[in-house]
Amino acid sequence: MELDKETQEKIQELQSYEHTLQNLLMQKQAFQFETNETENAINEVSKSKEEVFKIVGSIMIKTDTEKISKELKQKLEHLSIRLKSIEKQEIELTKKIEELRDEVMKKIK
C-alpha cells in the first residue's frame, strides 16, 4: 500500500514523539529512584543517634545531622518539582501521540 507524503510525515512525527516519550519515561524512572534513595537517607539520618557522614567526591566527611537533613529535604523538594514537570510533559506528549495515531489510522484505512 502506497502512503501519501503527508501520511508518511505524520508517521515519522509519531515515531519521533514516541521516542521522546520513551526518553522522558527513562528520566522519570531515574528521578523516582533518586527520590526513593533520598527519602531513605532522610529516614536513616533522622533515626541515627551516631555521627553522620557525607560523601563528597571520593572522600567521606563528618557532617552535622541538621545540616545534612536540611540538604536532603531541599534535594527532595527539587526532585519533586522535577518529577511534576516530567509528569506534565508525559501527559501532553501522550495526548499528542494518541491524536496523531488516530489521524494516521484514519488515513491508512
Identify what each model region corresponds to.
Residues 1, 46-50, 107-109:
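Generic structural signal for short, solvent-exposed loop/turn connectors between secondary structure elements
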Residues 1-12:
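N-terminal or membrane-proximal amphipathic helix/coiled-coil initiation segments that transition from
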Residues 10-31, 35-38, 45, 72-100, ...:
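Amphipathic alpha-helical coiled-coil segments
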Residues 43-68:
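Short coil/loop "hinge" linkers that interrupt or connect long alpha-helical coiled-coils or helical hairpins
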